[in-house]
């Protein structure tokens, strides 16, 4: 009987810890849309960049957005320690910087590199959502960039069903 009780406690403890991470999603309401994180309304009070996490926390901020994934693990870990969430940016190649969206190998390579990143960070407790790109439409002519963005978003959703995706 004690063994059953012990096993039940282990089972329910692991079940409860799995339920804590309910993910982040958007719901439509009568007045618009709301961001829900781990089952509760979440209002972003954030900043771009990660250099001033302590100051952001001190003034009541709760979220940051990055432009890319350089130092992503450290940023996510540091943010988590402070109770700050991260909208993790995925820097998409820019035509104005020489990225060629007619080059299928380059586009596929970009997608594959993002796959590794999604798998690495999708379960990090500080992750709020993904931000695909940053001003890719500034001075561009090749509309295939949007096909790539759509493919990236579909790939993310196939791997990570717990976090929304936005483009910037």
PLM ranges: what are they?
Residues 1-7:
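Sec-dependent signal peptide recognition
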Residues 7-15:
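Hydrophobic h-region of N-terminal signal peptides that target proteins for export
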Residues 19-32:
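Short acidic, Pro/Gly- and aromatic-enriched capping/linker segments at domain boundaries
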């Amino acid at each position: 009987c004690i063994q059953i009780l012990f096993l039940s406690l282990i089972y329910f403890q692991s079940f409860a810890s799995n339920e804590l991470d309910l993910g982040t999603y958007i719901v439509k309401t009568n007045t618009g849309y709301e961001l829900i994180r781990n089952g509760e309304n979440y209002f972003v009070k954030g900043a771009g960049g990660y250099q001033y996490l302590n100051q952001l926390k001190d003034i009541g901020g709760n979220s940051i957005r990055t432009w890319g994934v350089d130092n992503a693990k450290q940023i996510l870990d540091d943010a988590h320690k402070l109770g700050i969430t991260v909208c993790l940016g995925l820097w998409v190649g820019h035509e104005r910087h020489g990225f060629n969206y007619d080059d299928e190998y380059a586009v596929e390579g970009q997608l594959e590199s993002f796959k590794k990143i999604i798998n690495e960070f999708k379960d990090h407790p500080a992750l709020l959502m993904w931000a695909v790109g940053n001003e890719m439409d500034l001075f561009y002519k090749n509309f295939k960039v949007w096909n790539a963005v759509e493919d990236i978003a579909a790939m993310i959703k196939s791997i990570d069903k717990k976090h929304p995706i936005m483009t910037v």
